[in-house]
Amino acid sequence: MGPIPGAPPGVVDAYVKQSLFPSCFANDLPARKAAVLAATQRPISTVTLGQPSGPPAWAEIPSWALVGTVDRVILPATQRFMAERAGARIVKVKASHLSMISRPGAVTGLIVAADRATR
């Protein structure tokens, strides 16, 4: 984490250390790809993590969730808990936190299935 010039105290940029990125964030990607992603990641402001998001959309509309079973950022049990609480249709995929990169077909399939189910 690093300070943001002109930001209020305690607001910092958050990022994953390049040395840890492959093993925790991209643990199912080839080493070279994980290294490139680590080097090119963009930080997020920690202020975004504390802002209210409003009423949950899943309370009003059907939901789907892809659970990455080898995710080391958001544990699979936590993902399942959130998906079950939302009443989501759950698809489990052997994927890290970056399932959209490591398993794009599974992610696309879930999106297409959700689209077809709601037409």
Language model regions located:
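Conserved loop-alpha-helix segment in the C-terminal half of the alpha/beta-hydrolase fold
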Residues: 69-94, 101, 114
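Helix-rich cap/lid subdomain of alpha/beta-hydrolase
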Residues: 1-54
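Short glycine/proline-enriched coil/turn segments at helix->beta-strand junctions
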Residues: 42, 60-61, 85-89
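Small/polar glycine-rich anion-binding or flexible loop at a beta-alpha turn
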Residues: 56, 100
